[in-house]
Amino acid sequence: CLSSGFVIAQDDSANADLGAANALAAILQETQTLEAQVDVLTLDQDGREIQESVARLIMEKPYKVSWEIVSPYQELMLTDGIRIWRYEHDLEQVSIDAFNNDISRTPVLLLNGEAAAIADSYHIASAAMDYGTVQRYILTPKAADSLFERLSLSFVDGTLTEMQFEDSLGQKTSLTFSNVRANEAIDPAVFIFQMPADVDNLEVIDNTGF
């Protein structure tokens, strides 16, 4: 009957999502720490360049992340898994918020590689490209209020090379990873925010309520 066919189709889709999520998680779980240079390119819906920047990413599982834009302006996003700091150098402003590990709203947290969380938040498909040398995973958010319509992660020999996402307005952002170093020890101090000493009138906005 129609209803049973619908259930079977749903089950097949769920199994495909979980299978792709497990395959993606298996790759990500090989990496406990990650350091990389990231070239960021954002295009509008017509393919025109909106912004180009260079950032430095440092991550340590489960939820420690340092994302520092170094060009053409300076900005730092840092989390220790409890709080998240955002420092805008030009504005001389620091905002502090409670950390949220919702991977449907923060794509970089996909790199934490928890299969169940990925499958809960995204429909997932996988595809081999360039004669099998590139493995790409395409993720479509399940939540209607997701900030992104579509995301993809590409790997070569298990190393992350590219991450792309598209928002509801058709704006596309591509992150290209280079100088990737995985599973090397990271100084714990990297994930401790230090108030800049060279700023005279630093504005601090603390939204944590801690």
Which residues fall in each region the model found?
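Boundary at the C-terminal end of the N-terminal hydrophobic targeting segment
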Residues: 7-11
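N-terminal mature ectodomain segment of secretory-pathway/periplasmic proteins
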Residues: 23, 28-81
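Short, solvent-exposed helix-to-loop capping segments enriched in aromatics
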Residues: 28, 105-119
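Hydrophobic lipid-interacting interfaces of membrane-associated proteins
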Residues: 41-43, 87, 170
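An acidic-aromatic
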Residues: 56-107, 173-174
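Gly/Pro-enriched, hydrophobic low-complexity segments
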Residues: 95, 115, 119-204
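Short, solvent-exposed mixed-charge patches
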Residues: 208-210
